[in-house]
Amino acid sequence: MLDVKSFQLQSFLPLPYEEVLAPRLKRAHEKLQSGSGAGGEFTGWVHLPRDYDREEFARIQAAASRIRANSQALVVIGIGGSYLGARGVIDCLCSPNYNLKRKDTPNIYFVGNGLSSDAMGEVLDLVADVDFSVNVISKSGTTAEPAVAFRFFREALEKKYGREGARERIYATTDKARGALKSLADSEGWETFVVPDDVGGRYSVLTAVGLLPIAVAGVDISALMQGAAEMMEACTEASFQCPAWRYAAIRYELYRAGRSIELLACYDPAFRFMAEWWKQLYGESEGKEGKGLFPASVEFTADLHSMGQYIQEGKRLMFETVVRLGPSDRQLTVPADEADGDGLNFLAGKSLDFIRDRAMEGTLLAHTEGGVPNLIVETSGRTPADLGQLIYFFEYACGLSGYLLDVNPFDQPGVEAYKKNMFALLGKPGYEDRRAQLESKLEG
């Protein structure tokens, strides 16, 4: 089972902070469990690992099997919570080099998360001469980046297979009853999957939003959900026995002590997009009303050679949360070299994992001694069940953290500001007055 460990935090935290925070955490816990807190209408994810729709889950598995059988590539169109979780899980469980590996599952390309002609054009080129399918993910169907991307890939599908053939290769994950994408999918006869009304995008990786692409990659999504269910059960414990309580409490107390940045560190490159998912989860949930930790991430040991100097001796703004994944199935040992010109024969016969763990321990000690608090989130393995536990753990701790800050962890009103400006500057009907104001500001 996943565990949270503090690392020599005594000098950084008031003791006993657990006793002081316990009543507030209990209230936050009760709000999550009952859906009675701010944004409670979006807490469907809390019991999702137990209550998910089994019929739709079976349809997800069937669709994934069809895609694996008839496609050499799957194009996943989505932005933010509509793609980060799936990409994170696939990278973590399959490989960040997934598309380069020899395998019996399709390549998976993620688009619609930006507005780059080069990036979009490259993926269009990559799928031009192979059989491919598309999974477009959008609650409304009107979010600019994925909606624009879908136009390109729908056109490519219809040119390649005809409108009828394309119909069998488009899968829409969207609202169950309304919205532009739902209306279009129903009129065209595409298979649809549901973005639940009571689950926000950044909490949706364990719904069809994440599960369909993850299943196409060959990951056992039943085991993923089982792991999440195990952590859900652990999080029903209204005490510091719950790992999410410990994590939420430590980060809140460090925030109160003046730490404004949380640096998520992992020693495995496969975790990079899980860290990107985590950044959105915590950034959108906490960052409002002038409050919240700024979530950032680093990949060690690589970033010890770029950011390590600042972490060690720069301004004392941050603390580190180190994610330690369980043992790897693959073990490489350092070969001996008779000449020993690099002086590294003292490492001969030792595994890379052993060396990495000593690097981690040395870094924990150095950064702590340099005034940077550290805590460790540790999984017992690297299986789908382990990652399911980790996903639910971060989600539950995030909900607790938002309520500790007295903010709504389930809305994101600030995201609309750039959208309104962008639409006005692009000439969207109804934004004429705003466009004139913005153009005047840009000229000034």
Can you annotate each of these PLM segments?
Residues D91-C94, D125-V127, R151-F153, D186-E188, ...:
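Short, solvent-exposed amphipathic alpha-helical segments in soluble enzyme
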Residues S82-G85, S117-A119, T142-E145, R178-K182, ...:
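Flexible loop/turn segments at secondary-structure boundaries
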Residues R59-Q72, V123-D131, R251-S260, I311-R316:
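Glycine-rich phosphate/diphosphate-binding loops that line cofactor/substrate pockets in enzymes
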